[in-house]
Amino acid sequence: MSFFRCIGRSALFMLDPEHAHRLAIVGLKSGLNGCQKVVDKRLSVTIAGLKFKNFIGLAAGFDKNAEVVDEIFRLGFGFTEIGTVTPKPQIGNPKPRLFRLKEDEAIINRMGFNNDGHQVVDDRLRICKKAGVVGVNIGANKDTVDKIDDYTVGIAHFYDVADYFTVNISSPNTPGLRDLQARDSLHLLLNAISKARKEQEKKHGFSIPIFLKIAPDLSEKELDDIAEEIKLSDFDGLIVSNTTLSRQGLNNSHFSNEEGGLSGRPLFERSTIVLAKMRQKLGKEIAIIGVGGVKDAQTALEKVKAGADLIQLYSGMVYEGPNLVITILKEILQMMQQDGVDNIKDYRDHNLEHWAKFPL
């Protein structure tokens, strides 16, 4: 058992979750975790025209305001995603809004896109060294009537500083946001964003990849609709998935009835099933980033085997500590050596049929 699990986690878990998160940000700024790297070309992946040093990224939500972009790469991540960022700053939902379900190694949040807004985050990004790929996760303000417009504004604002965009329409904590996943609304959204990208591409002379982040709480028909719209659009891929509203499989936790999106270990199965189904529906060429319940080398590799090109994690680091990524990468390399695998991408789709067969 790691030092973090023995000592550090107990100390941090005595604090309110938001206070602990703030302390983690401050600690990273102070360089308390040193610098850790696992550099091996067998872990590198190229998708959507971007080369990732390794296949593990930090999911949006940890570094909402681009405060520790450079520091994140010292933890071993191959890429990071800041945000979700909205055009105007907003404070989010009332506190308490973040809850640890320790028995389940899970988190429930109803943060509500609390962030510093486009301009402040943009200013911070422009002074980063960017030791790896940095994505910008964009969203809509709670009080915005035309939410699609907020996304096109985000594309324009960050176009010359982002390595890729994530269009987040799947958070359960902004009223009406998930409605944009419905086919008619999604069609309008994807067209508007594609138009915004083309305008910026003409202006700047290069194209930035765009991913759509979807919820796990979707029916087979809804997944079919999303897949068809993605194939009709010029989007580069999907991120599967955001947090879930389901509480299936939880222990009788004190906080299990709190409203908000659930992440962590209980999300792994559902998100991996949705991932595999979307890989089947989209085919081999469209990129997919798998996220949800990754906590060790086994769960990380299973995402790839279910169809992911890259993976992201966040909640796993809360429970396993800042050395998690390094540990996963080292163990994955050992697995590759044992299996005679030349590159992590060679594992992709190995268990696709297994995961895709499960009902939603």
From Swiss-Prot:
GO terms for cellular component: cytoplasm; plasma membrane. Belongs to the dihydroorotate dehydrogenase family. Type 2 subfamily. Its main location: membrane. One of its GO terms (biological process) is 'de novo' pyrimidine nucleobase biosynthetic process. Its EC number is 1.3.5.2. One of its GO terms (molecular function) is dihydroorotate dehydrogenase (quinone) activity. Binds 1 FMN per subunit. Its cofactor is FMN. Monomer. This is Dihydroorotate dehydrogenase (quinone). Keywords: Cell membrane, Flavoprotein, FMN, Membrane, Oxidoreductase, Pyrimidine biosynthesis. FMN binds at residues 60-64, 84, 137, 168, 213, 241, 264, 293, 314-315. InterPro entries: Aldolase_TIM (IPR013785), DHO_dehydrogenase (IPR050074), Dihydroorotate_DH_2 (IPR005719), Dihydroorotate_DH_cat (IPR005720), Dihydroorotate_DH_CS (IPR001295). Substrate binds at residues 64, 109-113, 168, 173, 242-243. It comes from the Bacteria. It is a peripheral membrane protein.
